[in-house]
UniProtKB/Swiss-Prot annotation:
ATP binds at residues 11-18. One of its GO terms (molecular function) is phosphotransferase activity, alcohol group as acceptor. It catalyses: 1,6-anhydro-N-acetyl-beta-muramate + ATP + H2O = N-acetyl-D-muramate 6-phosphate + ADP + H(+). PANTHER family: ANHYDRO-N-ACETYLMURAMIC ACID KINASE (PTHR30605:SF0). Pfam families: AnmK (PF03702). Belongs to the anhydro-N-acetylmuramic acid kinase family. Pathway: Amino-sugar metabolism; 1,6-anhydro-N-acetylmuramate degradation; Cell wall biogenesis; peptidoglycan recycling. This is Anhydro-N-acetylmuramic acid kinase. It comes from Albidiferax ferrireducens (strain ATCC BAA-621 / DSM 15236 / T118). Catalyzes the specific phosphorylation of 1,6-anhydro-N-acetylmuramic acid (anhMurNAc) with the simultaneous cleavage of the 1,6-anhydro ring, generating MurNAc-6-P. Is required for the utilization of anhMurNAc either imported from the medium or derived from its own cell wall murein, and thus plays a role in cell wall recycling. SUPFAM superfamilies: Actin-like ATPase domain (SSF53067). The lineage of its organism: Bacteria, Pseudomonadati, Pseudomonadota, Betaproteobacteria, Burkholderiales.
Amino acid sequence: MSDLYIGLMSGTSLDGVDGVVVDFSGAHLRVLAHVNAPLSTALTHELLALNSPGTNELHRAALAANALVRVYAHVVAQLLELADIEHSAVAAIGAHGQTVRHQPQSFDGTGYTLQLNNPALLAELTGMDVVADFRSRDVAAGGQGAPLVPAFHQSAFGQPDQTLAVLNLGGMSNLTVLGPCPATESPAGVLDADPPSCFHSHDVLGFDCGPGNALMDTWCLQHIGQPFDADGAWAAAGRVHGELLAALLDEPYFAQSAPKSTGRDLFNSGWLTWKLEKFSSVAPVDVQATLTELTASVCATCVKRYGSESSTLIVCGGGAFNSHLMVRLQALLPRLKVISSQARGLPPLQVEAAAFAWLARNTLLRKTSSLEKVTGASGARILGAIYPA
């Protein structure tokens, strides 16, 4: 079996599709190619709309899934060209899909998670094996189905002599806390292809903190016509409104204990509109500053509660490029060193895509990937369904 895998990720931020080719042949994984492909405005709007109940949803969701998969196939073609490899050299594609509903419950029969995808079509378009549907087995086992990347974070960033925290700032924010890993001998910046021998669920904690970029991006698009706040410059020009921040923080989800997960089912434009009802006089730029402070505050609180022994906070995802947000995180966490994942050998936009390449590999090798302490499932499970070429 080949040691080359492709990972494809389109997250709740809806800022495009990230794809990577990863080589797992050596002691340490290597990313051979990375592509970021934007989604069309029409597809982005439809995927956003499908996060909420509407008319003719089944038909629209099927068409949106097909459209997304055609973007996936285009990304795969670009990756093969950049890496200068044939499709036959790749063992499988790990394709996450687009989460449009995430309502996990524990063992009561009502929990579900839905990622729009058509892995059969992707296998047909690429001529490659596809692994998809990574989350549903964990939900079936009573887990949250999210986050799934902490296991990968341990293999990629775990260190032998220190506790680390990894913060993914996508549409939502999720935190991983990694305990020391004595069996690891990899120096900082070197990424392990396989988990070290100390890799157990008790070494890793992970959960969704709350909103990441989603609310900030929504507000930006609505008021300045931009899909995101570049470098956080707009937020930096405003002032945090204390009463509005308190109202935003008055959300039961933030007080819940881990394991927990969330998404646009909760933190969406409707939630923001509701919270802003009593603050119509606040200038849009100050709302943006306050939304940025919300993300920073929620994430910092989670780090203090669950990762107080951490020496470093490694930030990945699109939010790592928001300079103002990174400054606020460092200010709220003065005892930690806040750095981009780039400093540890993996650029921020490659981390989640690489994680799904890693998860696909585990599926083919029949290795478990979920961590019961992270998701709350009844045990570790092999994740994903295989669609042969």
